[in-house]
């Protein structure tokens, strides 16, 4: 019997080995060494959360060399007698970083799907963003300049590759399904906002502006007998390239900071978020552009409305009072900067300085034949270009075709019109469908927050996305700002990423 039991156990082991033969595992590994197949749900949640943190840190750090190399010469373009500066090389690192973190984001999404952190069967509506990506490829291929539409043009760098990076960041955000991981990600995002705000404030103070690099320290003002003339203007940009990018980023992050300050249970986090919010409020005002004021105002007003309704459900008026105080403090900061002449709107000068001086891709401004406000003027140009390229657009970032249509600049400073003119009516319509689906999810998140069904992070990401969409009417997408929106949008979708699993557990 002893020997019989021994041979029977050996036969069983042999049978088990045989049944595992022929199975494919990730990276060609065996089942025991396949760390992804053996990963627990908690480990998968940690992987997704940690990667999203790494992604936002990379997006923050990668822009810094572009600033500190702006005056370092490395050669001469003799064909046009132009000095070459090292920052022209580093700007490509930013778009490359967006592509890289987006590509890895897709991989993280696939892993999350394997580990049931994202249930594709419960998210069939993902077919819409997939269609947007595939049709964007067609728009790129039909462009008059496929190379530019694929890689992007110079410092804009918003070609097809960057678009893929954006959607990869959306996918990465969608995988962060554990609420504690969302809170930790929020901590890093708010920290980045505070960092950019501090840099922006230092750029706007004459005494410190001398040592903090900035592309908007001097604004192009025209030509004279001696050549080009500039005026000193201390404008906040952070390390985000332009005041418009700073406005977009701080709009998104202010929503995280304000909601975390109002509703989180930890006192230390409340204090950190509150201080960060004050810094971001000041820096946003010092950006001196309409979308900064519009986005910031939307954050406070929407959060105040939510807090008022929440106080009725929870019978706790502390968040509403705290939000009202924050709103008053923000008004005080604005009044102080306005009284000291530090606040002024310089949208038109900034727009043309950015395109003419920083990017060298357009003329010096519009003619003197009109007194129309700059935004409707640019919107008219954008709509005309869209009408001439109605179905598939000009192709992503294809500035050449835009200029051929008579536009004075390659952007309309309205993200929706920019999308319509660059990628056409079909992709525009599908993107609107995607945004409507996202807004519906946001409404459900806020409704759930009112009834304590989900945490404040759902309210924060909803406010962040909505306020970004509001300021986008006066702004442009950018490799330094748009990634934060796409991560926030992914976080909105993360709350329904595992819908069926949640139902089974309940």
Which residues make up each language-model segment?
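Alpha-helical transmembrane segments of multi-pass inner-membrane proteins
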Residues: 10-18, 22-23, 28-29, 40-61, ...
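N-terminal hydrophobic segments of proteins, predominantly signal-anchor/transmembrane helices
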Residues: 54-75, 99-164
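Helix-to-loop transition at the C-terminal end of transmembrane segments
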Residues: 67-74, 145-147, 200-214, 338-349
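Juxtamembrane membrane-water interface segments that cap and precede transmembrane helices
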Residues: 73-88, 148, 223-239, 373, ...
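Alpha-helical transmembrane segments and their immediate interhelical/interface regions
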Residues: 74-95, 147-178, 293, 346-353
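Membrane-interface catalytic loops of GT-C/OST-like multi-pass glycosylation enzymes that act
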Residues: 150-155, 244, 288-295, 410-414, ...
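TM-adjacent membrane-interface loops and short helices in multi-pass inner/ER membrane proteins
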Residues: 208, 345-349, 353-409, 416, ...
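Membrane-interface capping segments at transmembrane-helix boundaries
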Residues: 497-505
């Amino acid at each position: 019997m002893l020997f019989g039991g021994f041979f029977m156990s050996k036969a069983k082991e042999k049978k088990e080995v045989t049944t595992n033969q022929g199975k494919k595992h990730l990276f060609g590994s065996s089942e025991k060494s396949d760390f992804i197949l053996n990963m627990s749900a908690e480990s998968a949640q940690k992987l997704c959360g940690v990667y999203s943190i790494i992604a936002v840190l990379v997006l923050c750090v990668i822009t810094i060399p572009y600033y500190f190399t702006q005056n370092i010469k490395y050669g001469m373009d003799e064909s046009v007698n132009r000095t070459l500066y090292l920052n022209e090389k580093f700007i490509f690192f930013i778009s490359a970083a967006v592509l890289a973190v987006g590509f890895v984001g897709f991989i993280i999404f696939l892993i999350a799907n394997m580990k049931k952190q994202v249930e594709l069967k419960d998210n069939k509506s993902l077919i819409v963003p997939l269609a947007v990506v595939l049709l964007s490829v067609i728009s790129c291929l039909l462009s008059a300049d496929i190379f530019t539409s694929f890689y992007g043009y110079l410092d804009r760098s918003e070609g097809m590759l960057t678009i893929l990076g954006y959607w990869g960041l959306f996918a990465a955000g969608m995988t962060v399904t554990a609420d504690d991981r969302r809170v930790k990600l929020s901590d890093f995002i708010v920290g980045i906002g505070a960092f950019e705000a501090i840099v922006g404030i230092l750029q706007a103070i004459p005494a410190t502006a001398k040592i903090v690099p900035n592309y908007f320290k001097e604004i192009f003002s025209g030509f004279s007998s001696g050549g080009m003339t500039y005026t000193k203007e201390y404008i906040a940009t952070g390390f985000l390239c332009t005041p418009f990018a700073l406005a977009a980023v701080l709009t998104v992050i202010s929503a995280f900071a304000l909601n975390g300050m109002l509703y989180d249970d930890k006192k230390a986090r409340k204090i950190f978020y509150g201080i960060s919010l004050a810094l971001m409020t000041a820096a946003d005002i010092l950006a001196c552009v309409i979308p900064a004021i519009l986005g910031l105002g939307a954050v406070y007003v929407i959060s105040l409305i939510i807090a008022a309704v929440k106080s009725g459900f929870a019978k706790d008026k502390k968040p509403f009072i705290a939000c009202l105080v924050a709103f008053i403090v923000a008004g005080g900061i604005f009044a102080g900067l306005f009284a000291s002449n530090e606040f002024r709107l310089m949208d038109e000068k900034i727009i043309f300085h950015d395109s003419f001086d920083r990017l060298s891709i357009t003329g010096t401004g519009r003619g003197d034949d009109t007194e129309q406000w700059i935004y409707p003027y640019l919107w008219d140009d954008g709509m005309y270009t869209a009408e001439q390229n109605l179905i598939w657009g000009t192709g992503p970032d294809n500035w050449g075709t835009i200029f051929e249509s008579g536009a004075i600049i390659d952007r309309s400073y309205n993200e929706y019109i920019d999308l319509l003119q660059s990628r056409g009516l079909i992709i525009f319509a599908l993107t609107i469908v995607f945004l409507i689906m996202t807004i519906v999810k946001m409404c459900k998140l806020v409704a759930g927050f009112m009834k304590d069904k989900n945490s404040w992070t759902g309210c924060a990401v909803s406010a962040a996305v909505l306020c970004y969409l509001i300021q986008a009417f006066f702004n442009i997408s950018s490799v330094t700002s748009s990634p934060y929106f796409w991560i926030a949008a992914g976080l909105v979708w993360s709350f329904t990423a595992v819908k069926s699993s949640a139902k089974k557990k309940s």
